[in-house]
Amino acid sequence: MVNMKASMFLTFAGLVLLFVVCYASESEEKEFPKEMLSSIFAVDNDFKQEERDCAGYMRECKEKLCCSGYVCSSRWKWCVLPAPWRR
């Protein structure tokens, strides 16, 4: 019985210690997730889409016309694939 109490106490103490370490590292590095996400999703100038006269799939079509093969959704104002119910 004593052995089980000791193991439960050690488990609980380990969880508390893990929580304290995680909280301390999070409070030190609050900007780390933002920096990591911005570096992952950073877009290089070579990979940027070129500006077109028409809007492609799932692009806004308020001011631009949709490219061939797409229609402007009256509800969402996006360029979508034409379907029988969108006539």
Swiss-Prot record:
Source species, domain of life: Eukaryota
GO molecular function, one term: sodium channel regulator activity
Tissue spec. comment: Expressed by the venom gland.
A Pfam family hit: Toxin_12
Cellular component per GO, a single term: extracellular region
Signal peptide feature range: 1-24
Disulfide bonds: 54-67, 61-72, 66-79
Residue span(s) of the pro-peptide: 25-52
PROSITE patterns associated with the record: HWTX_1
Subcellular location: Secreted
Keywords in alphabetical order: Cleavage on pair of basic residues, Disulfide bond, Ion channel impairing toxin, Knottin, Neurotoxin, Secreted, Signal, Toxin, Voltage-gated sodium channel impairing toxin
Gene deletion effect: The natural mutant mHwTx-III does not reversibly paralyze cockroaches.
Keyword flag Disulfide bond: yes
Note: Negative results: does not inhibit sodium channels of adult rat DRG neurons. Neither HwTx-III, nor mHwTx-III agglutinate erythrocytes.
Record note on domains: The presence of a 'disulfide through disulfide knot' structurally defines this protein as a knottin.
UniProt family annotation: Belongs to the neurotoxin 10 (Hwtx-1) family. 51 (Hntx-8) subfamily. Hntx-8 sub-subfamily.
Protein name, per record: Mu-theraphotoxin-Hs1a
Upper lineage: Eukaryota, Metazoa, Ecdysozoa, Arthropoda, Chelicerata
